[in-house]
């Protein structure tokens, strides 16, 4: 069984060389040069969180300079947040700059979304992107899952998720993550597989296929036997 954590902010040093999991570590642009030396087994997503999109011109400029690095395999996390962060007239242009980078470099987009489903829905329809857009830490309800799935969003689930929404997330649109939680990626797999009433090996196999399709350059972990 191969384990993939497509969005995490923390890799414990003792887990850095764990051969049984492969992670995509989320970093800010100015953190990347140090992180790529510290975490040599892992790949990165790099972007500016919507909470910090105000006065982000320098980080955006630097992101555009480093985002072509092959160790950066996704752009973000970026996105829209109605609860925290600057006004949307600041967040939206920064988000759209990430969309442009994603398309230019042909790298998937990792999206943070809080109560901004309608805006994201319309921005995606307008942008008509060629690259995958992944809603990380998705906790939306079944109606939101169905709506966003129809226009091509992918979904990454972590420790907390809406059980009812799983019915409306296609198997080939599902990913797993730990984000900032203290549980392991194996525990996330086990939770979701249990809700879906799927064998853990079968579930992990489907997630592996999804990851390898969307992130073809991501290093494969060794198989974990449980």
Residue ranges and their predicted role:
Residues 1-226:
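Mid-domain alpha/beta scaffold segments of enzyme catalytic cores
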């Amino acid at each position: 069984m191969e384990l993939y954590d497509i969005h995490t902010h923390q890799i414990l040093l003792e887990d850095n060389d764990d051969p049984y999991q492969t992670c995509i570590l989320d970093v800010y642009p100015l953190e990347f040069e140090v992180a790529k030396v510290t975490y040599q087994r892992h790949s990165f997503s790099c972007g500016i969180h919507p909470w910090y999109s105000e006065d982000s011109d320098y980080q955006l400029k630097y992101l555009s300079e480093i985002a072509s690095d092959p160790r950066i395999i996704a752009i973000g996390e970026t996105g829209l947040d109605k609860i925290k962060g600057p006004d949307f007239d600041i967040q939206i242009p920064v988000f759209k700059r990430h969309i442009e980078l994603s398309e230019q470099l042909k790298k998937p987009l990792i999206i943070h979304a809080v109560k901004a489903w309608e805006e994201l829905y319309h921005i995606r329809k307008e942008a008509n992107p060629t690259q995958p857009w992944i809603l990380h830490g998705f906790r939306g309800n079944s109606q939101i899952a169905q709506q966003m799935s129809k226009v091509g969003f992918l979904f990454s689930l972590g420790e907390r998720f809406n059980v009812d929404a799983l019915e409306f997330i296609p198997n080939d649109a599902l990913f797993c993550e730990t984000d900032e939680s203290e549980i392991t990626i194996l525990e996330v797999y086990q939770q979701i597989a249990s809700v879906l009433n799927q064998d853990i090996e079968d579930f992990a196999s489907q997630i592996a296929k999804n990851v390898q399709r969307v992130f073809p350059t991501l290093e494969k972990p060794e198989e974990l036997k449980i």
